Amino acid sequence: MSKSPWIIHYDGSSCNGCDIEVLAALTPLYDAERFGVVNTGNPKHADIFVVTGTVNEQNISVVREIYEQMLEPKVVVACGACACGGGVFHDCYNVLGGVDCAIPVDAYVPGCAVRPEAIIDAVVAGIGILDEKAEAMKADPAAKREPGAEGAKGAHGSWAQVQDAAGAHGAGVACETEGEQA
């Protein structure tokens, strides 16, 4: 990648434990900037979308809007048990599930709360995925990734991808979007 990857962070409905860990990962103690990571508040400038918390009826449109405003290529990282599958809030009346109920996810970071080191590992893995997507776009400029085209886990998404680095174990949870199983 010829430029530093810019990330945008969004916290859905959660206990804010993972949200705090994402912020901790951006502090000098963990020094995410050594990988060239820059935090931005503008989706049009972001390459990597880091999401914590669940997707619910109130924030699903926000999650989708941020995703759609990002330019291709883009990577989505779901951080924490809530973002991966709904977590402890999964059975709440307004919770639809994890991030993959709304948009395709490329990397999952299970844990409650997820460790800052695991978040950094996922973002670094996301840089590799971003490079792959950029190369694919050069090879086929007409190809564009549509939400849901690769299934619930996205083109690269898997539990094992970041699970070993995270040192945590997660389990997939089926989610419901508009009454259908994803």
Q: Residue ranges of each PLM-predicted region?
A:
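Iron-sulfur-associated redox domains of electron-transfer enzymes in respiratory
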Residues: M1-A182
